[in-house]
A protein has these predicted regions:
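Conserved redox-cofactor binding core of oxidoreductases
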Residues: 107-226
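N-terminal glycine-rich phosphate/pyrophosphate-binding loop and immediately adjacent elements
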Residues: 1-124
Length: 229
């Protein structure tokens, strides 16, 4: 395959799919390389299929942490996606933004443009939140389908209420204006199937002529000439 690309992105994971979409929609040519296969495994798309993916070597790197005294010197299994969509294709589909204080902390340490006020517009741009919410914090019309759980178990209601009785504030939207406290999770689902970044961002990017995707392509090194790869 010969393709003269403005950008080569290594890894079609949660970030790689988004960057491919954003660059290509601006007219840049992009070559996206992924070590794993296409996301055609049926369990990738069925929400309950996550149980079959947590250690499946076909779509999972199956990393392990280094032994630490605090964990009893154990190696902890650390699933990471090895498939189009990366870990967004094998995770539990929960949608949880980072805490605003973390972003503000990065900005205070010198990471300009990374305060929560700076990144919030991109959170809003990326999502299509189906359950309303504060329009200053939630977005509609984006490729990432975000919704509240359609079925909530009685045990979940009891857990949230117990947290509230224990003194934690109850948040109506943990991804909205009140991320602290206890509340209900949200998920990324497209129709009745998983809403990975491969099915949302990359699905529209790959229709463009300026995008090429190569799966099962392991990158072993980079060659630079005059500061260009």
């Amino acid at each position: 395959m010969e393709f003269d690309a403005d950008y080569i992105i290594i890894g079609a994971g949660s970030a790689g799919c988004v960057v491919t979409d954003r660059l290509s929609e601006k007219g840049h040519s992009v070559l996206l390389l992924e070590a794993g296969p296409k996301d055609i495994h049926p369990m990738v798309h069925i929400p309950a299929g996550v149980l079959h993916l947590l250690s499946n070597p076909k779509v999972n790197w199956n990393y392990s942490s280094e032994p630490e005294e605090s964990s009893g010197n154990r190696r902890i299994h650390w699933p990471r996606g090895r498939v189009l969509g990366g870990s967004s294709s094998i995770n539990g589909m929960l949608y949880v933004r980072g805490n605003p204080a973390d972003y503000d902390g990065w900005a205070q340490m010198g990471c300009k443009g990374w305060s929560f006020e700076n990144v919030l517009p991109y959170f809003r741009k990326s999502e299509n939140y189906k359950n309303g919410g504060d329009p200053e914090h939630r977005g509609t019309g984006g490729p990432l389908e975000v919704e509240d759980y359609r079925t909530v178990l009685d045990l979940t209601h009891a857990f949230v209420e117990a947290g509230h009785q224990a003194g934690y504030p109850k948040s109506q939207d943990l991804n909205g204006s009140m991320p602290e406290g206890v509340g209900y999770s949200q998920m990324t689902r497209r129709g009745r199937l998983r809403g990975s970044t491969a099915r949302t961002f990359l699905s529209r990017a790959k229709k463009r002529k300026n995008v090429k995707i190569k799966t099962e392509a392991i990158v072993t090194g980079l060659i630079f000439e005059n500061k260009k790869c």
